[in-house]
Amino acid sequence: MTNHWDVIVVGGGHAGTEAAAAAARLGAKTLLATHKLETVGTMSCNPAIGGLAKGHLVREIDALDGVMGRAIDRGGIQFRILNRSKGPAVRGPRAQADRALYAQAVRAILADQPGLTLAALAIEDLLIGNDGRCAGVIDAEGGVHRAGAVVLTTGTFLRGVIHIGTQTTPAGRIGEAPALGLSATLARLGFPLGRLKTGTPPRLDGRTIAWATLESQPGDEPPPPFSFLTTAITTPQISCAITETTAETHRVIRENLHRAPLYSGQIQGVGPRYCPSIEDKVVRFADRDRHQIFLEPEGLDDPTVYPNGISTSLPIDVQLALLATIPGLEKAEMMRPGYAIEYDFVDPRCLGPTLETDRLPGLFLAGQINGTTGYEEAAAQGLIAGLNAARVAGAGERAAPITFDRAEGYLGVLVDDLITLGTTEPYRMFTSRAEYRLLLRADNADLRLTAKGIALGCVGAARTAAFEDKRAALTAARTMIDGLALTPPDLARRGIAVNQDGQRRTPLDLLCHADIDWARLVALWPELGAIRPDVAEQLEIGARYAGYLERMHGDVAAFRRDEALVLPADLAYDGLANLSAELRGKLTLARPATLGAAARIPGMTPAALTALLRHVKRRERDSVEECFT
């Protein structure tokens, strides 16, 4: 095997697979190095993809020809649209996965990717060139692998430690060794490291669960795919089930809190605020006597069940005792105990918008190493890091950065939040984090991003053709609709009351009426039934929310004006006397690329922004004057 590559990606999880595939799609000769090839694409925790805001990320990854959407469509065994009864901005696709089928799909997609090689290697160190750039990696056997750029996607493996009661085990995932050398290397290079914690629930034997006594939770029919390339889901579908904890469950937990590593002081890392362990729920929400649990089968031919909602690191005997108090699980057998895992992460404020590090050019970080939680957040970062690693490896500093701003997608919101605000707890994406969420819907991710992907060169021929077909279908549908305009008397004869103002109205004009939807339009104009469902959805949303969308486009224009005001990379914030010491410190740490990014730093005031803008303009003026003296 060659020891020189354009891009080397370390780690075969969700961030690593997207990074490697993205780099290869841009033509980079890419190596994906991971401990075990059989674990590539493994779902370490919950067997599901998507959800609120997370589903938006998956659709955006797919719009740029990424892996995750296609893989879950092949391996998904239950598909749902969450928040279907709410507005389109907050609807999120989610799919339950067959773990084995999902991992197989990921590996198959990677195997079909030209220019990508996978190798079982334990990477222990980084290679630094004489020019101070990251020049490759060194494996556990001392082998040197050179590259133009390196992407670290180490997940929970950086100095990972598993906790089950008082028992601690160094591991990156249960049964797998941690990455100790890389953590030491990052510390030696001066990267600011922190410690985070996440957890997983016990796995249950589904054959010992009393399913008949539980509430069933079926998926949507027909199953809504993730990928814009998928026409239909062909994998057999299953139902999940719902149960809940009881007062007795909470008593068992409270009586054993002294044995919980989370409360004994054994765990120092900060856990995810929005995905707490069951012991944390019982303490934080002491007034509640029950918490919902979703019983999620892990595969069509696998009896393992994932009880979503009872992540725990309590001792095994306590886990068994609390399971026996839950309806339907009284006789359930535990196949594997739940556990917590602590791991190192890097403060993401030392990254730029391409996810390249400021301390070591040529090194990119993606996934949980940047303080995030969730498969989808990791995959999104992997995509961005992989694309930029390929550009840097091919063109060096001349490479135009590949970035996404907050008005382009959740991809941009995610990266901007991380590099501007940093995080002290595992970061999770929510629709509430996106200011322009009505524009950044899951349903229009391809219309927002695929053209950009085509221009960048990361979108293949099949997706390009599908995208052009959809755009042509939208144009044809609008032309047809414009020819269906009717006068108020004509509409009245069809049972639709409008102002008798003499103005002709198209079918889309009528969607501002709360009682009129697309189905009613088709009943009135049968020819509309020939329009593709995905195209009809775009037309309906665009018409129904036209006023809101127009105002939001105005907001985006104002946002882009601020983003266009670039702050010099070498700006010495310590010398800005008009700013408080606190703000000078925050600006020095975050080093925002634009005035807009500076405005999003906590504590930044309008007065401080004005002072910053004046300083930059004065500096530019002085620089121009020097050129003529």
UniProtKB/Swiss-Prot annotation:
Family the entry assigns: Belongs to the MnmG family.
Alphabetical keyword list: Cytoplasm, FAD, Flavoprotein, NAD, tRNA processing
Positions bound to NAD(+): 271-285
Name of the molecule in the record: tRNA uridine 5-carboxymethylaminomethyl modification enzyme MnmG
GO biological process: tRNA methylation; tRNA wobble uridine modification
Residues where FAD binds: 11-16
Compartments, record wording: Cytoplasm
GO cellular component, one term: cytosol
SMART domains in the record: GIDA_assoc_3 (SM01228)
Cofactor entry: FAD
Name of the coding gene: mnmG
Assembly behavior: Homodimer. Heterotetramer of two MnmE and two MnmG subunits.
Entry-linked HAMAP family: MnmG_GidA
Role this protein plays: NAD-binding protein involved in the addition of a carboxymethylaminomethyl (cmnm) group at the wobble position (U34) of certain tRNAs, forming tRNA-cmnm(5)s(2)U34.
GO molecular-function term, one example from the UniProt record: flavin adenine dinucleotide binding
